């Protein structure tokens, strides 16, 4: 059974070996996320090499995502996890040290220290550990813990009511982007996006490195990102609803409503949407998710999210492969009761991004024709990825087989809802239609006498403008030997 909603897996110590990565791929991974808040270029480079070798060997559109560290406040390295209890105190310092309970822990960036005030609430590791500032000095802050937990290396830290304007991109981010371009990665997830200018500035950096069209995913995780959401969505290629930091920066009870708003608005704007953070969190330790987690994943799918993301579950959890299999099972079961027709009508009515009235008419009419004719799939040839991305926003019941000669587009489409990318060297319409039908049959999407709708481009036309309703049998009747001399 196919799954239209895509799965993103964060790669970490639990999964960064060839054997584990292949198991994740077999379980349903579509995108491998590398979190550049952790690790080095050397360690990420090893993982990237394994992923590239794996996707070539298996001939699959596995995308690789670079997630930037961004302008966040974060703890430094600790010698070993520091266990804390209510009432315990810990010193945070500006100088770089290997942290311990006795010597304290480094806090990055050092520019935040002058802005910290006593009695300010502190949340560590997405709010799992809570503390309060009891002593604030120029290069040192002392905090007192309000609950028990373990302080680990590089964990996120949030200080309430701190008014400091951090730069959107740090020197590390720029170096990481350069590395990502050199490694020919497929997607960039930009952390803590506040406005469309942040996206524009990142595009300029990517352009300076020779990759101006590298897709950028805007992570929405603070109040400015929410406030400026519409302009950010138009500037970015996709949206990630980063619920962890969002639930710290705003009230946690606001997150479900914001999730629904952003999923809907992303779709209407023609942008893919990723729902992230704590989706199957208990599976970091346990072999089964909670009922609430299953409902959380299902509701994200009902909201129309393009992809769901696993973080700690696959990066450092005890059951990474089973977590992916569980996620895929939830997707497949939920999609049985997904109201495709309602989404189709709603998206046409509320579409906020009219790419062109002509293309809108072709796409909308084509999906209607395909559904009324009981077609089993849509096949579309694309060089830029625009046509399948455009069709995906309507959330059609029909799988979209996207045929492309562009390797970057092939991998980039891995994150799009309902899109199944296929790489070809052919521009001959008869040949690529034949290849797409063979691909569909091999993947279990199509059978011999199924009807299909083919989107293609007429001679001299820039946009997709040709719709053909045919059958798999008619396309495959002449063999490739007969088609190609």
From Swiss-Prot:
Question: For this protein, what reaction is catalysed?
Answer: pyruvate + ATP = phosphoenolpyruvate + ADP + H(+)
Q: Where is this site: Transition state stabilizer?
A: 219
State the EC number(s).
Answer: 2.7.1.40
Q: Which SUPFAM superfamilies match?
A: Phosphoenolpyruvate/pyruvate domain, PK beta-barrel domain-like, PK C-terminal domain-like
Q: Which GO terms describe its biological process?
A: glycolytic process
Residues annotated as binding K(+) are 35, 37, 67-68
Q: Which EC class heads this enzyme's classification? A: transferase
Binding sites annotated in the UniProt record for ATP: 35-38, 74, 155
Q: Name one GO molecular function term.
A: kinase activity
Which amino acid positions bind Mg(2+), per UniProt? 221, 245
Task: Give the matching InterPro entries.
Answer: Pyr_Knase, Pyrv/PenolPyrv_kinase-like_dom, Pyrv_kinase-like_dom_sf, Pyrv_Knase-like_insert_dom_sf, Pyrv_Knase_brl, Pyrv_Knase_C, Pyrv_Knase_C_sf, Pyrv_Knase_insert_dom_sf
What GO cellular component term, any one, is given? cytoplasm
| Cofactor(s) for this UniProt protein | Mg(2+); K(+)
Q: Which domain of life is it from?
A: Bacteria
For the ligand (substrate), the binding residues are: 33, 244-245, 277
Which pathway is recorded for this entry? Answer: Carbohydrate degradation; glycolysis; pyruvate from D-glyceraldehyde 3-phosphate: step 5/5
The alphabetical list of record keywords is:
ATP-binding, Glycolysis, Kinase, Magnesium, Metal-binding, Nucleotide-binding, Potassium, Pyruvate, Transferase
Family statement = Belongs to the pyruvate kinase family.
- Which PANTHER family does this one have? PYRUVATE KINASE
Q: This protein is called what?
A: Pyruvate kinase
UniProt organism field: Chlamydia trachomatis serovar D (strain ATCC VR-885 / DSM 19411 / UW-3/Cx)
What gene makes this protein? pyk
